[in-house]
Structure formats: structure tokens, C-alpha cells
Amino acid sequence: MTARLSTALGAALLACACGAMAAPAAESESDDMVRLLNDRGLLVQLGDQLGQVRHTVGEKASELVMNAMGFLGVPYQRGGSSAETGFDCSGFVRAMYHQTVGLILPRRADQQAAATTTIDKSELRPGDLVFFNTMRRTFSHVGIYIGDNKFIHSPRSGSEVRVEDMRLGYWQTRFNGARRVQASDSQP
């Protein structure tokens, strides 16, 4: 997925999620994006997730979350850190923070947990990091919280960037904690 397509997809998702009315000049661009998403089979895949985002994030969605949503469907790639090659979980989080906020987080999920500020699960807000024990070790998986107990992540080999509910049994039993990224948490 090119950066231009990613940006356009993010903008289309933002418009859909917020229920924004497009200006007449922008309607053709929006229609073109809908056709592109439909032609690639992404509109059907994103349908339910767009509805979740509309109700979950609404107008309070951070630029980080909306940018991340633009990468739905990008394949998982172990060690991957770009849309062109695919993402692993920590590569996805690192890329989103670097692209959107300009912060460079550590590469591995456990390093990201150690470098960020611990918060209580009840304090989660869109853009915070959520960590899970998926490989029999703490902080072995990371995602970006988007609100309403949902997070976006790159889960595992053979899958792609997607939104999931933290209340599902698998994620609920493996939850390790929540972290907030502060400007001082980035590496030079």
C-alpha cells in the first residue's frame, strides 16, 4: 500500500467514521476512494469495522488512530515495519507513532512497554498502547487502543492489520497492561 493510498484511505475512513459531509468539490474524490476500496474488496472487509469506529471513536478520534485505521488489511510480516513489506505488532505501533506523532518508539513490544508510562486499564483512551502475553512471556504483543475496549494491531503470520475487542476471551485472559506514550518516551 503506497503512502498516498494509505493517506487517502485514512481520510476516507475519517470521513465515514465521523459522518462528515463532503464539500461538492471533494465528493468526486470521496466517490473515487469508495470505488477504489470496493474494487480492491476492502469496502466489504471494512464495513463492520467502520461501523465500530463510527460509534467507538467518533469525533474524539486522534490523528494517530485514524492513521492506523488507514492500514487495515496490510499483511502481517515478522520483523516488518512498513505497509510495503507488512507489519509485525511492534513494527506497526512504531510506524504509526513515527508517521503521525514523530516519536520513535523502541522496536520490540517488551521494549515499548518498558519505555512508556503505565496506566490503569480504566484510564485507557484512544492512542494508548495495550499489551498481551501471546507467546508465554509478558509484553509479547502490542496494539493501539481505539476506544470502547477495541484495539488495532497486526496479530500474527497469515493475518493482517485489524480491529479486535479486548473483552473477547483470548485477549482478556492475555492482557498484560496498558501504557501511555509521552513525548519523553521516544528514542533520539
Which role does the model predict for each range below?
Residues T2-G10, M21-P75, V181-P188:
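Intrinsically disordered, low-complexity
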Residues R4, H55, L103-E160, D165-L168:
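...with weaker cross-activation on analogous glycine-rich loops/strands in unrelated enzymes
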Residues A15-A20:
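Short hydrophobic alpha-helical membrane-anchoring segments
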Residues H55-S62, A83-G91, T118, G169-Q172:
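Soluble non-cytosolic domains of exported or imported proteins
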Residues S62, M66-G70, G91-A95, Q99, ...:
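Solvent-exposed, polar/charged alpha-helical surfaces in well-ordered, non-transmembrane soluble domains
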Residues A68-G80, M96-L105, T134, P155, ...:
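Sec/Tat-exported extracytoplasmic proteins
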Residues V74-P126:
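Catalytic cysteine-centered active-site loop
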Residues M166-P188:
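Acidic, glycine-rich catalytic/binding loops that coordinate metals and/or anionic ligands
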